[in-house]
Amino acid sequence: MRLRLRLTAPLLAGLRLARLSVHLLHGMAVMALRFPSLNEAGRQARIGWWSAGVLRAMGVGLHITGTARPGATLLLVNHVSWLDIAALHAAVPHARFVSKADVLRWPLLGWLIRGAGTLFIERERKRDALRVVHAMADALRAGQTVAVFPEGTTGEGPELLPFHANLLQAAIATATPIQPVVLRFADPTHRFSPAVAYVGDTTLLQSLWRVATARGLEVHVTLLMSRGSAHADRRLLAESLRSLMAEHL
């Protein structure tokens, strides 16, 4: 007769957080020692492996539907948690994120996110958004894939916040296709899991603990069909894409 031991929530969380810490430290060593000698394909492979490892360390299952469009693409991604970057990079390791500069202060994670080629925006500086849009356009012209959170901040999860249409301008200016990506974190009953919500006054440590104690957590990454952006009205396009993404949450 085979016995199954069910760990208490604090013990489960402790084991997961210990695994995450080891994984992050290993990632830092790889980035410092191996990244300089790797070509672009090698770096992308490492980013994908590391991102999937973050999810595994925290006990989060990964399910990917659809494929990323090849070539220059702007990815629109709904924003729920600090886990979003790991989830998308596990599915699309070559994507360059646009993220708030606050993440640079996250222990270990911030340094690794910077090393993955992330573009940072300082939201307190009104003109910084224009600088980032120009940087996004340069990356798209170079044939890269850029990922943005059009909501601008994390939401509760089941419903989308209004989209900031100005983030689409880089794609419109360069006639780059836009591909919506929907992240859905679910519990064992397939309902949205509130454990991942990183909103309000929740601290990073509190969010880490909630995720670490959650059982049967899964993230579903759905890559929808891309859409052309040339000569589009950015506000109308943003609202249309928001409606499309809402249908898949």
Where are these regions (language model features)?
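A membrane-cytosol interface segment of integral membrane proteins
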Residues: 119-140, 145
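A cross-family acyltransferase "interaction/gating" segment
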Residues: 108-111, 158-232, 240
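C-terminal alpha-helix
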Residues: 243-248
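Catalytic core of membrane glycerolipid acyltransferases/transacylases, capturing the structured
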Residues: 26-38, 42, 56-57, 70-126
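A transmembrane-helix-recognition feature enriched in membrane-embedded lipid enzymes
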Residues: 2-63, 111-116, 214
